[in-house]
Swiss-Prot record:
Belongs to the IL-10 family. SMART domains: IL10. This is Interleukin-10. It comes from the Eukaryota. It is found in: Secreted. Major immune regulatory cytokine that acts on many cells of the immune system where it has profound anti-inflammatory functions, limiting excessive tissue disruption caused by inflammation. Mechanistically, IL10 binds to its heterotetrameric receptor comprising IL10RA and IL10RB leading to JAK1 and STAT2-mediated phosphorylation of STAT3. In turn, STAT3 translocates to the nucleus where it drives expression of anti-inflammatory mediators. GO terms for biological process: immune response; regulation of cytokine production. SUPFAM superfamilies: 4-helical cytokines. Glycans are attached at N134. Transmembrane segments: none annotated.
Length: 164
């Protein structure tokens, strides 16, 4: 066997072995996902506490953005999908607008966003443990109300982040 062919075979086998090792690592981290979730949620709450007062003081609306039906979706078979959609909603629609309230707020909102991204990544990586298939009507309702509130929606959504 020519040395270049042997080298190619060795490289191929090394990649296969590395891929299997990475797959095992991802699988192992997913096994521990339920145990690490409370810690991740505590980190999110701690990050949110840095901006909570600001957004609560600036939310002048009496209505609630997050509804009982969303809570029911979180608890039901749509739980993972509703959570995934809400994370995407906050990362793509709420937080970019929330960052526009000064450099100090932006720093804390960015930190909160990074923790949400980490949670979203873990949810995606461990999707076998949490089926995410159907769209949540409650999340669609939240998005609709948020858009109707226009610039006041960001205060409402950020104020209610801890409910989410």
């Amino acid at each position: 066997m020519p040395s270049s062919a042997l080298l190619c075979c060795l490289i191929f086998l090394a990649r296969v072995a590395a891929g299997q090792h990475q797959g095992t690592q991802a699988k192992d981290s997913c096994i521990h996902f339920p145990d690490s979730l409370p810690h991740m949620l505590r980190e999110l709450r701690a990050a949110f506490s840095n901006v909570k007062t600001f957004f609560q003081m600036n939310d002048q609306l009496d209505n609630s953005l997050l509804s009982q039906s969303l809570l029911e979706d979180f608890k039901g078979y749509l739980g993972c999908q509703a959570l995934s959609e809400m994370i995407q909603f906050y990362l793509e629609e709420v937080m970019p607008k929330a960052e526009d309230h000064g450099p100090n707020i932006k720093e804390h909102v960015n930190s909160l966003g990074e923790k949400l991204k980490t949670l979203r990544l873990r949810l995606r990586r461990c999707h076998r443990f949490l089926p995410c298939e159907n769209k949540s009507k409650a999340v669609e309702q939240v998005k609709s109300v948020f858009n109707k509130l226009q610039e006041k929606g960001v205060y409402k959504a950020m104020r209610e982040f801890d409910i989410f």
